[in-house]
UniProtKB/Swiss-Prot annotation:
Gene for this chain: rplT
Protein's name in the database: Large ribosomal subunit protein bL20
Family, per entry: Belongs to the bacterial ribosomal protein bL20 family.
Keywords: Ribonucleoprotein, Ribosomal protein, RNA-binding, rRNA-binding
HAMAP family per the UniProt record, alphabetical: Ribosomal_bL20 (MF_00382)
Length: 119
């Protein structure tokens, strides 16, 4: 059986890690042990924050909706309750976008929610 020298495979593996560690600072970009650890940790952060991103955006939409309905004499929770009672099915992302880009349309939805609460 022929002897297998593993230099080519090792070099390819290291190259892959270095490519992922591109842009890192200090030894984390050019020492294989540090680069591997940094790339692993970066992967953990990426996985965790893909989940967290959904929560963060929902919180942002809620804050924007709340800021838009307060001048209309309502709070966020009262507004959402009014929407549910009036049968308006619009998600928070769309409501937030409407509040920013189409204030008149958002105000019409808010009036509908207010009317449903009064009834």
């Amino acid at each position: 059986m022929a002897r297998v020298k593993r230099g080519v495979t090792a070099h390819a593996k290291h190259k892959k890690v270095y490519k992922l560690a591109k842009g890192f600072r200090g030894r984390r970009k050019n020492t294989i042990r540090a680069a591997k650890a940094a790339v692993d940790k970066a992967g953990q952060y990426a996985f965790r924050d893909r989940k967290r991103k959904k929560r963060t955006f929902r919180a942002l939409w809620i804050q924007r909706i709340n800021a838009a309905v307060r001048p209309l004499g309502m709070t966020y929770s009262v507004f959402i309750n009014g929407l549910a009672k009036s049968g308006v099915i619009v998600d928070r992302k769309v409501l937030s976008d409407l509040a920013i880009t189409e204030p008149a349309a958002f105000q019409a939805i808010a009036e509908k929610a207010k009317a449903a609460l009064a009834a």
